[in-house]
Curated annotation (Swiss-Prot):
This is Golgi-associated kinase 1A. It is found in: Secreted; Endoplasmic reticulum; Golgi apparatus; Membrane, Caveola. Residues 53-58 are annotated as: O-glycosylated at one site. The keyword Oxidoreductase does not apply. GO terms for cellular component: caveola; endoplasmic reticulum; extracellular region; Golgi apparatus; intracellular membrane-bounded organelle. O-glycosylated with core 1 or possibly core 8 glycans. Keywords: Endoplasmic reticulum, Glycoprotein, Golgi apparatus, Membrane, Secreted, Signal. Residues 143-162 are annotated as: Disordered. InterPro entries: FAM198. Glycans are attached at residue 566.
Amino acid sequence: MASWLRRKLRGKRRPVIAFCLLMILSAMAVTRFPPQRPSAGPDPGPMEPQGVTGAPATHIRQALSSSRRQRARNMGFWRSRALPRNSILVCAEEQGHRARVDRSRESPGGDLRHPGRVRRDITLSGHPRLSTQHVVLLREDEVGDPGTKDLGHPQHGSPIQETQSEVVTLVSPLPGSDMAALPAWRATSGLTLWPHTAEGRDLLGAENRALTGGQQAEDPTLASGAHQWPGSVEKLQGSVWCDAETLLSSSRTGGQAPPWLTDHDVQMLRLLAQGEVVDKARVPAHGQVLQVGFSTEAALQDLSSPRLSQLCSQGLCGLIKRPGDLPEVLSFHVDRVLGLRRSLPAVARRFHSPLLPYRYTDGGARPVIWWAPDVQHLSDPDEDQNSLALGWLQYQALLAHSCNWPGQAPCPGIHHTEWARLALFDFLLQVHDRLDRYCCGFEPEPSDPCVEERLREKCQNPAELRLVHILVRSSDPSHLVYIDNAGNLQHPEDKLNFRLLEGIDGFPESAVKVLASGCLQNMLLKSLQMDPVFWESQGGAQGLKQVLQTLEQRGQVLLGHIQKHNLTLFRDEDP
């Protein structure tokens, strides 16, 4: 029996040995090579080893196709293949006892090193589905300054470098979120002093921008950019826009439009200064005033010329006024510098169009005012220069009631603060037509219309006094629109019309900041350089010196009035 069992076992020895060898080889294969997981996307290409000091060499396949690169730019983190089970990913700081990972990789897009990237020791072990995506998301959560990304970085050429820049922004905020380092950082990164100034808001002589003719033109009071202007008095005084030595074309301003002009302003100024005149019409009862339609380059290529009414409904019209109305151009820039944004864009221009009568093409500069398509006019012939009929006594009553909304007498629906903006604007320019066309608040010259038309005789009866040019737009009926803003810049200081300020209990903070900063003259000089025809017609900075000094002095008088009567200041967002 024993000999039979021995022979039986000897016969089975070879299969058992073979089986044991097979098991050993299988175990060696399992332990020698890491498991591979199926890819969820396209083939990422060959794997490349990453040299790791102080840790076993680990082969990690990184997948970043072109579509994933785009998603990485948009989402702000890298996507990668899953890590092998029991593997270790180390993002170590540069210390001798810690592991360092070399992330360099050759590619057509360039070098992918991340020299400025924050490094941390992160060990991912024991989880087969944990990927590098989670590592970057963890770093995102640890970023201390969420606003750093919005400051931007200089752009690079390749898509891969752009992706790198996004990741660096997420994980490399300014050290300690030190906001004091922002000015120097902006200077080195090529950012402008006024980050809200949009790309393309350059001087009128620079490249043309396409003008789209929408049914409703963009509201200048709501357009992007200028709503952030101005900052504090200290920021104004320290800015290049207040610097007396800096010209608008200086490299310090970057050749950009001033920050108080919106994108809509720049587009309309360019249209008025460069648009081709394609149609015209006289304005009844307004003498030398012509309404003209302008065409953009795109519209000129169209064989069918649009009618004047079509152009005007698209915001592509302007009013050519008399040479004596050139101060309206200055008034527009005063409005924008003060942050009021209620006047319609205006430029000076010399016309050469064969469509215009000779007196418009004789080489003299004339003001051109943008025609807003939705300004409301009453149907009453006696009140057609108003959007609502308003007398002096009614005006004083609504000021006393602090009216904001319609439906309760005597409130017409115009925001209460609108009257303060109007009073400030008219006082600085000494525009009397709106609030005091009868010249009740000052001693007029014999040549003034209120004397020639014997209007001043009505000052004895306030019930007969009417306000004129009280206009709103249908797209924004709670805000006023200023027209006919030529003003009187030769009016002596001892004859200033303080009746324009009667009943006003506060003024816009933004405008008062500009007046208090002492920067009004220098800011207006830079703003007026946007209009080369007006600038040259007035004799440049030297020719404008006297009128700008007059405006500065009137601003100081207004500040004294505010202080004397202890009047309040309101923010732009206050109704």
